[in-house]
């Protein structure tokens, strides 16, 4: 009915009678087959829930301290892998550009935070990263704060 109103309004003539909508089908309606239940989709292992995330391993007798002297930003992955394997890492940035070293330190800070570890500055360009199962005693330099500044106000 609304279509007839708009057709007349815009001057379009419709030759088909409107009563075609009122005819009933001569055949009774067929019943649709019952829906077949589909199996529930399986979960993909590409997404890891927080509860299943990797946690720092428990202390064992094979814990090591790794020494790393990165040359490029990609070497940061090696440092984080050592941490995830439960080893402490001493990192010397002496041979690296300061801007790239800063980016690696930020990467290391994120990794140590994720495994509840610690990162400490030993010297101007030397850092100690430890997983949760290591205890650091003594204090050579201040611990890095979350904003990247140590107690001396140095940024790293």
Swiss-Prot record:
Residues 17-44 are annotated as: Disordered. The keyword Zinc does not apply. It is found in: Cytoplasm. GO terms for biological process: division septum assembly; FtsZ-dependent cytokinesis. Keywords: Cell cycle, Cell division, Cytoplasm, Septation. It holds the Pfam family SepF. HAMAP family: SepF. Belongs to the SepF family. PANTHER family: CELL DIVISION PROTEIN SEPF. Cell division protein that is part of the divisome complex and is recruited early to the Z-ring. Probably stimulates Z-ring formation, perhaps through the cross-linking of FtsZ protofilaments. Its function overlaps with FtsA. Homodimer. Interacts with FtsZ. This is Cell division protein SepF.
